[in-house]
Amino acid sequence: MASNDLKTWVSDKLMMLLGYSQAAVVNYLIAMAKKTKSPTELVGELVDYGFSSSGDTRSFAEEIFARVPRKTAGVNLYQKHEAEAAMLVRKQKTYALLDADDDEDEVVVEKKSSVSESRKSDKGKKRFRKKSGQSDESDGEVAVREDSRHVRRKVSEEDDGSESEEERVRDQKEREELEQHLKDRDTARTRKLTEQTLSKKEKEEAVRRANALEKDDLYSLRKVSRQEYLKKREQKKLDELRDEIEDEQYLFGGEKLTETELREFRYKKELYDLVKKRTQDEDNVEEYRIPDAYDQEGGVDQEKRFSVAVQRYRDLDSTEKMNPFAEQEAWEDHQIGKATLKFGAKNKQASDDYQFVFEDQINFIKESVMAGENYEDAMDAKQKSQDLAEKTALEELQEVRRSLPIYTYRDQLLKAVEEHQVLVIVGDTGSGKTTQIPQYLHEAGYTKRGKVGCTQPRRVAAMSVAARVAQEMGVKLGHEVGYSIRFEDCTSDKTVLKYMTDGMLLRELLGEPDLASYSVVIVDEAHERTLSTDILFGLVKDIARFRPDLKLLISSATMDAEKFSDYFDTAPIFSFPGRRYPVEINYTSAPEADYMDAAIVTILTIHVREPLGDILVFFTGQEEIETAEEILKHRIRGLGTKIRELIICPIYANLPSELQAKIFEPTPEGARKVVLATNIAETSLTIDGIKYVVDPGFSKMKSYNPRTGMESLLITPISKASATQRAGRAGRTSPGKCYRLYTAFNYNNDLEENTVPEVQRTNLASVVLALKSLGIHDLINFDFMDPPPAEALVKSLELLFALGALNKLGELTKAGRRMAEFPLDPMLSKMIVVSDKYKCSDEIISIAAMLSIGGSIFYRPKDKQVHADNARMNFHTGNVGDHIALLKVYSSWKETNFSTQWCYENYIQVRSMKRARDIRDQLEGLLERVEIDISSNLNELDSVRKSIVAGFFPHTAKLQKNGSYRTVKHPQTVHIHPNSGLSQVLPRWVVYHELVLTSKEYMRQVTELKPEWLIELAPHYYQLKDVEDAASKKMPKGAGKAAM
């Protein structure tokens, strides 16, 4: 009986070939394919039945012939070996095998000599004892049986090598087929987010029609169809009632009607008026509409602006008169407006009378002044700003472009690009390198033969810069100018200037190793030396040698350009001065114990005492920024209207795009803006109006120990180069000040000169997998600018081999090629690939998405910590483990239709959940790309746990007598993180997501496992002695029950 999948496939093919399909025809074709002996014979029979003799019919016959199951005669391997051995013995009576040195496969035989026969017989006599009456045939049978054992042993040894080689070749062939399928899918799916697509109604209709064949959706489709019909029926009946009233008025207008007829007519009319009024009330919804600030000529529509002033004096129209509560609602709005707390709007000059004195204010010492360079005086800058205010928005943008320092060197830059294939460009931050160079290349005609790609180390920078360039060019974002980041592709076929993260360009190299669609590649912010940037250096260097027509520009904001030049074969350096105003550097007189509190106090002191000008503060991450924002709002609220308005604008990677754009909005007159940023604001973003910089002197850096496999995100002191970059932010538009929350002694003696490249301090497993996918196998000799530790590379190769991504020759397997498609850690990718075997891929991608967003899912307000902990533990009911708890969180949120209120009630960060949903949607699309079916097995949680263990089996630990855990491989004492749901249960065996180093070595995201699973899922990694659980050993009190 053919499987359902085969029947569905044949049915689809019949629809394509003939235009119809029936179950009987499908079964008949499958039976016919089973009976035929070759595809050619099947083609002949199909043509006889009416199929066209075309290539489509031939390919259909070949595919169905290959797909249908066939009956094969079972062969007894033992009998086969017995027969082969008997044949060899018979041949050996006349032939003997001689050793041949030239080829293993060639065997030279010749006649046996009498001496060899006599020796053979002698040996036979010694080996076998004849019984009385035993015939020669019995001796022959014994000899055959003995020789057959020898032959089987020899054949099995040869088969082990040949089977492993055949398996390797088969796996390589399957991997090549998978890569070809991926390329075909990419070619077929050319539509992007910004292309001209169907309307919303057409999309909904297309989706509804596509799902119409799904039996599970039939009920919901019927329900939706009935609801839509009721809406149409309501409007239809309303029109019929109106027509009926009009007809009766026309026909019986002058006639005398009875009382019953009059009552019925009045009833119809009242009913129609009520329904009509309700419809008008529903249509009259109060909503905000984005105002059009400028007309087509670029000027302000003054009449529209001043029409608001006379709004209260105009007469009400007919629709407003129908609202009897309009006056009441207006009065309520007025009263609510008076009762609303407002502060900062009066703009009192309180500093003229007195100054605030903060109890915990900090004493700063003016140490030095950073000299300015190529800057304008205050009068010229003020006159230029007045001139810009009189121009239209488009003229203002063009004038700003011409005022950038790089504009003076435009022609020289284009000439240098034309004369040299590789060019190193050096210019200060804010000089216009990122926004202007791609536009200059576009204007010079480089985009006629390919795109101009510009990489950025951060997602926020790629999005904001692309939006700015699109605005300057006067085009819509996503058309001529677009961006591509990890979970968003805002490009189209029209895109010629493409901004992207360096990681996205690495992923593009998987499908296009020679970057054939690009004419120019710009590696921007090269001085940051991120992991992806260092890998790109080696790849684009080889591509530039292979493609002489490709232009390669390396852009940096620091003067350490000689190193880049030497790496790229002594490439020429094009440097130009920026515009930098003098910056006063202030250090604290004594070290600060709490840099968070010191930063808050410094912000308030600047806001109260210093002249107007925006403030930029550097923090290490999102958590610190949100904490500082909360404290600032609380303290400002206490000061009320005594101080000017302070606008707080955070900026970090996970912040939504609309909130990120607020940092670029001009500050209202009389107010001050404070930007709370990560180190993204050092070089990637340029914010106008910044006059004061507060530098705590710390940043978050990844640190990886290849021996223990522990990767931690540590808060570490910045380098002197980063400190200089941060101080330079204050001198962009006017003379400024930088407040460093550390002493001058710390700066001179404790800070490193430059930041350690990320490639030397992070886990390289995903990078090694990406390079292997690109066909780069000699990783030790890969052309790194700063080579990573050899031990880290070896550990990464060992991990990938253990995960099955590499074979014993170091070649990429089909599973490894699938894993490379997922933008995740290799162990997470392996977990997803294995989930296809256990039919739980739907649950696993939800867990992977939740793990990818880190530990920012639950939050604990200081005043409601007990409630938050109880809400979190509700998801751990039954000691299911942290992974299953994350799955419960996402599933529960999905069941509430992604409710924001549900997140508030359960103390879950809705922003993190939305990001997890975006990640999951992308992973779901990648499942189809790598040919993995989406399946669900929520009732069988052991299948989910086995998939987790299959990906994270190197991360296992066993409970010790003292209540701590010991990792099985590379023994190390670790503990379950206090936030884990199993921190009090203490199971005997656990698998963990990652190790983090805080006050102790903690395991995060822990799930219980059965030790026998390790032998089942990773027999190549674990032996029986590794997982033997001595049940007789005494465990600590309160230890968890045995593994499930």
Swiss-Prot record:
| Record-given protein name | Pre-mRNA-splicing factor ATP-dependent RNA helicase DEAH1
Keywords in UniProt for this one? ATP-binding, Helicase, Hydrolase, mRNA processing, mRNA splicing, Nucleotide-binding, Phosphoprotein, Spliceosome
Q: Where is the composition biased (Acidic residues)?
A: 157-166
GO MF: ATP binding; ATP hydrolysis activity; nucleic acid binding; RNA helicase activity
Q: Which residues form the Helicase ATP-binding domain?
A: 414-577
Q: Where is the composition biased (Basic and acidic residues)?
A: 108-121, 167-206
Its Enzyme Commission number(s) read 3.6.4.13
Which parts of the sequence are annotated with region: Disordered? 106-206
- Summarize what gene deletion causes: Embryo defective. Reduced stature, early flowering and altered leaf morphology.
